[in-house]
């Protein structure tokens, strides 16, 4: 059951990417609306969970909310530079590498005999699948070299900011459920910063603000489930399973958003998706092997 819960965020995160890609609008308006939706729903999730707000949880939760705000700004920049189907696989792979490394090295995950080897193989397959999904032929349709450079830089920045907060909360010993509400406050503060700092090319209120706010709400629900799942199955496994939404985002980017790919690129993407699914199965096995082994602190 814990594995099934850990998979739900991947569907929500994948749908979020497609929603933002399908309804683009002014970058300041879109970012602000996403943060407002995410912040408001996070506060609602916190009320439903009924978790206490300690001083430590509030401080670190707000910090994590601001980190996610920065990651979202960069990922939307990357979407516009080189598309959803290239951004999501790469940012996913980098986040997986970061969190799995921290989960194993700092928190002693995958300690059961054979679990570490199986987990590493699973991660390698998922990362290989992500790389395959973002691969582009030199002569094929797609972004210019300048757009690829901007997209790569923005994607790397988003991965660092997105991928750090689950392990940060565990490192400072803040229960994940306790951080959901404070993260909502950080996201609302991030909305204010987006409104103040990002270029003012259009008014905040305008077309397609509702889909952006809805996307933020989807993320907040997925985030609450992800943070709870990391407590049940560990950071390395919980975060990894939640990030498999890149499969949905990649396929949706090609079919729903109509992002251009050559026939060879589509074949490589299909192979990448297959590799990621195999990695998912192995990740579930590694997690089940690790059950009952207490991680070191």
Mark where each language-model region is.
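Polytopic alpha-helical membrane proteins, predominantly small-molecule transporters/carriers
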Residues: 1-297
């Amino acid at each position: 059951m814990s594995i099934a819960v850990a998979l739900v965020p991947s569907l929500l995160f994948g749908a979020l990417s497609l929603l933002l890609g399908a309804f683009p609008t002014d970058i300041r308006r879109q970012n602000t609306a996403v943060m407002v939706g995410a912040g408001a729903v996070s506060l609602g999730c916190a009320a439903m969970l009924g978790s206490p707000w300690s001083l430590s949880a509030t401080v670190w939760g707000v910090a994590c909310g601001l980190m996610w705000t920065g990651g979202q700004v960069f990922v939307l920049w990357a979407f516009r530079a080189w598309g959803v189907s290239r951004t999501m696989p790469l940012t996913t792979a980098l986040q997986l590498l970061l969190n799995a490394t921290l989960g194993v090295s700092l928190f002693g995950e995958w300690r059961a005999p054979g679990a570490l080897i199986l987990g590493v193989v699973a991660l390698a397959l998922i990362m290989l699948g992500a790389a395959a999904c973002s691969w582009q032929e030199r002569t094929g349709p797609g972004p210019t070299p300048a757009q690829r450079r901007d997209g790569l830089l923005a994607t790397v920045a988003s991965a660092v900011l997105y991928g750090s907060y689950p392990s940060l909360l565990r490192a400072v010993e803040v229960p994940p459920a306790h951080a959901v509400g404070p993260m909502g406050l950080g996201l609302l503060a991030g909305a204010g910063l987006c409104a103040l700092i990002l270029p003012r090319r259009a008014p905040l209120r305008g077309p397609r603000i509702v889909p952006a706010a809805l996307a933020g709400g989807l993320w907040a629900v997925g985030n609450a489930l992800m943070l709870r799942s990391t407590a049940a199955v560990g950071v390395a496994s919980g975060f990894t399973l939640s990030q498999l939404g890149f499969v949905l985002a990649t396929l949706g980017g090609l079919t729903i958003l109509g992002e251009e790919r050559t026939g060879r690129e589509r074949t490589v993407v299909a192979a990448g998706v297959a590799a990621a699914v195999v990695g998912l199965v192995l990740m579930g096995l590694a997690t089940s092997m690790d059950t009952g082994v207490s991680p070191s602190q």
